Amino acid sequence: PSKVKQILEKYITVKKGSKILDAGCGTGYVAEVLKALRYNNIVGIDYSKDMLRVARSKKIYKKLVCESLSKKTSLKGNQFDLVICTGVLTSGHVGPSSIKELIRLTKPGGYLILSISEKIFSKLGFKRELEKRSNEYNYIKLSKPFIALPNHKDSARSRMHTLQRV
């Protein structure tokens, strides 16, 4: 989430009333950062009912949806000014097929912020999926590698991919 804050403050402009999707929102950690930055029009989606229960208790989200990002969701396309997906695009969670859906949900001119582990970027097909869809977005920023979970046994280096939908 601190990397998301840095991107919002330095590299892209997202107005305060903008509609934001916290994709794979889990317990709402990213939404807490967004709220601190005075964003308040946030929708969350996650596959775990238990995680969503915790997220709901924080009273940050306008709407929470329990669905998988691995296939087309019930959410209307082209509606979000910003789609954030951190800590989700990884082995055992959500695979590269979700890239298509995340782009579909983003408005033309809107932004996507995706964190993807370097270890699996090519191996699991995220690189291939982004290349396949390269006519649907422009790269704004690719962060330097960073340790996403410093105190976790799987402390793989990740990168933040900031894209703008065309």
Regions from the PLM with identified roles:
Residues 1-16:
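Conserved alpha-helix/loop element of class I SAM-dependent methyltransferases that forms part
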Residues 21-72:
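Class I SAM-dependent methyltransferase SAM/SAH-binding core
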Residues 73-83:
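A short acidic, Gly/Pro-enriched loop at the edge of an enzyme's catalytic core
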Residues 86-87, 115:
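Residues lining the SAM
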Residues 90-92:
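A short His-aromatic
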Residues 97-108:
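A short glycine-rich, Lys/Arg-flanked "PGG" loop and its adjoining helix->strand segment in the class I
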Residues 109-117:
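Conserved beta-strand signature within the Rossmann-like core of class I S-adenosyl-L-methionine
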Residues 137-166:
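Class I S-adenosyl-L-methionine
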